[in-house]
Amino acid sequence: MKVISYNLNKHKAAGELDALVEQTGADILCLQEAVADELPDEISGLHLADSTARNRLGLALYYRRNTFTALQVRTLALKKSLHDRVLKPAEERMLAVRLRDIDHGRELIVASFHAAPLTALNALRRKQIAAALRELSSLGDGLPILMVGDYNYPVFKENLGQQVRAAGYELTLSDARTYTRYRVFRGHYDFATSVGFEIDDITTLPQGLSDHLPILVTART
C-alpha cells in the first residue's frame, strides 16, 4: 500500500496532486491545508472519502476505489492552540477513514493529521497526538492504523517517540527532511505513526510549490 501525505501550504500545491499520484502509483492521498470547496471528487483515479468542513484550511483523504471500500469516516477536534483561537475556526485536526481491502477482505484505518503550528508548545502537540491516537484506536479495535501528516514537531522527537510507543504505536520518519522555509526549523515535520503495519520505507518526494515536501509511505499489514 502506498500513501502520500502532503501539506499543500494554503492550497498552493493543489495543482501538483494529479502528477504526484500518477508518478508514485499511490493508493491513498492524505492532505493538510487544503481548501475543501476547491477539491475535486477524483484525483487521478483516487476518490475523495471526505474533507473537513469547519476548518479555514482543512484535511482531506482520497483512496483508490478498486482497491478499498470506505466504511466509516471520523473527524476529531483537538485541544486548541492560541493560533487556532485567533484564526478560528481551525479545530478539526484529524480525519480518519476506516477502509476494507477488497482483495484481501481486511479492514484498516488511515488518517490525515495536522498538529498545532510552531507558535504552540511541544507539550500541546504531544497532547493532540495522544488524543488522535486514542480516537483512532476506538474506531476499530485491533485494526491496523496508519496516521500520516504534518506533526509540526521538528526537534526533541525522543519525548514524542516515547509517548507514541507507550500508546502502542511506532513513529517512523522519512529518509530526508520535509520542511525548508525557515533555516532554523528545517527538519522532519511530516511523518507517520502506526500500529499493525510493516513500514517498508518513507520517502521524501521532490519539493513543489509548498514549503512542505510530500512524503510517500510504503506499508503492508
PLM features per residue range, with description:
Residues I28-E107, F113, E198, L205-P206:
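Structured beta-strand-rich core segments of catalytic domains in phosphoester-bond hydrolases
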Residues H11-G15, R56, R186:
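Structural motif corresponding to alpha-helix initiation and N-cap regions
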